[in-house]
Regions:
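N-terminal Rossmann NAD(P)H-binding glycine-rich loop of SDR-like oxidoreductase domains
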Residues: 4-24
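Conserved beta-strand positions in the Rossmann-like core of class I SAM-dependent methyltransferases
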Residues: 5, 29-30, 96
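N-terminal Rossmann-fold cofactor-binding loop
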Residues: 31-35, 53-54
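Rossmann-fold NAD(P) dinucleotide-binding segment
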Residues: 62-66, 78-97
Length: 352
């Protein structure tokens, strides 16, 4: 049995990760509930595979019993984190995933004491959600230790995979969220907007507030009590987001949600190899003190899915090598703000 289990290895992102892990000699065990998909993938990659659903705890324990770490790539993570984390606690297996779901970060954080007692690391969010933003949050907070406010923004050039689109539908009625005085507060979606200079020719970019995972994680990484996260989008898109908030009760009805999930299954595939090769991502971070002192830093990196593969495998390799601080962790909390600089093509610069 390999030291690394990749669960949900045949989804869009899971496939990219499984392929890269195999190419780099990690020899992962591929796992999930769909036998036909696993058989085909395992034959192509030359890997072992295990068919196991998350509602089969005894089988799941057997799959994880000889593993050092599991990388959960099966979303929506609101449905998958709990049975997998429970299995990790029972089998003393380190847990990593690629979620960006704020509520999932909070829920896994609540298991931190149990994980520490079991000698297990719980490290959600090891993809684009939230490694680059978490690392930049840690960096600007390190530059300004007395900061009491963090603002983070990102710009991504990509389509989305089926799994990401389904997760968006799963949370369509969640609205927005910010952290104020250390507590997460619900707010209307896109309730704030501003312009940001992402650098590299992308100045004056319009961004709007969204409930990115860093609303949860940045506080645990830095201790800064006020956090707002933004995504680049045209002003027209912001207006549509705000208008959509008026119909979210309709969108959250089970028949409507089921219809949206079906439509995604029929129409969404994710960026192709050329798009992943050419695309770039940008992150901007600002830390501010109560008396107005501020610092600004930013970074540029590969396409979001390409970056996810790199950061997921970098953190998994650290765990496999024994560098796995126990309890709940964030990427930069576990491995420092320079973790992201280990990804080829990432540049970081301090602006203010």
């Amino acid at each position: 049995m390999s030291d690394l289990v990749v669960y949900g290895s045949y989804g869009y992102t899971g496939t990219l990760i499984a392929e890269a892990a195999t190419e780099r000699g990690l020899d992962p065990v591929l796992a999930g509930r769909e036998r036909r998909s696993l058989e085909s993938q395992a034959a192509r990659l030359g890997c072992e595979f295990e068919v196991v659903a998350l509602d089969e705890p005894k089988v799941l324990d057997m799959v994880l019993s000889d593993a050092t770490a599991v990388l959960n790539c099966a979303g929506p993570f609101a449905r998958t984190w709990k049975p997998m984390v429970e299995a990790c606690l029972r089998t003393e297996t380190h847990y990593l995933d690629i979620t960006g779901e704020r509520t999932v970060f909070e829920a896994i954080h609540d298991q931190g004491d149990r994980a520490a007692d079991a000698g297990v690391m719980l490290l959600p969010g090891v993809g684009f959600d939230v490694v680059p933003t978490d690392c930049l949050a840690a960096h600007v907070a390190q530059r300004l230790p007395d900061a009491d406010r963090l603002e983070l923004a990102f710009r991504a050039e990509n389509g989305v995979s089926r799994g990401t689109a389904k997760t968006m539908v799963e949370h369509v009625d969640g609205g927005g969220a910010v952290r104020r005085d250390g507590r997460i507060e619900r707010v209307p979606i896109a309730h704030e907007s501003r312009t940001v200079d992402f650098g590299w020719g992308l100045d004056g970019q319009h961004v709007a507030a969204i409930p990115w995972g860093d609303v949860a994680t940045a506080y645990y990484t830095t201790g800064v009590p006020n956090v707002t996260t933004y995504m680049a989008m045209p002003e027209r898109a912001v207006q549509l987001q705000r208008a959509a908030g008026l119909v979210t009760p309709l969108l959250s009805l089970p028949p409507v949600r089921t219809g949206l999930q079906w439509l995604i299954e029929q129409t969404t595939e994710g960026p192709d190899a050329d798009e992943r090769e050419r695309g770039e991502s940008y992150v901007w971070g600002e830390a501010t003190t109560a008396d107005g002192e501020r610092v600004v830093s930013r970074l540029r990196g590969p396409h979001t899915y390409a970056l996810t593969v790199e950061t997921a495998l970098a953190t998994a390799r650290r765990a496999l090598d024994g560098d796995a601080p126990v309890g709940f962790q964030t990427p930069a909390g576990a491995y420092g703000p320079d973790l992201i600089l280990g990804v080829e093509g990432v540049e970081r610069e301090d602006v203010v």
